């Protein structure tokens, strides 16, 4: 792989990680702000508490379906915005 492609690839991976981390951090903060436990979310979704624990880890790559389910339990809607980058 050329240096340029490798650099672009690393940048893309970093952006992917940043999006995941930001999304999960926001859901966790909101859950905690409501005083809702991981167990309460797990019970409502019919999954184990460790599943929610994994979901809330920054390196976890959740499905959109799971994000929507967790958000729904917190009384949130999910909206995804695509914003044109300035560094095209």
What does each of the following model-derived ranges do?
Residues 25-44, 69:
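Short basic helix-loop element that most often maps to the first helix and adjoining turn
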Residues 20-21, 32-33, 61:
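Short amphipathic helical patch at the helix-1/turn junction of helix-turn-helix
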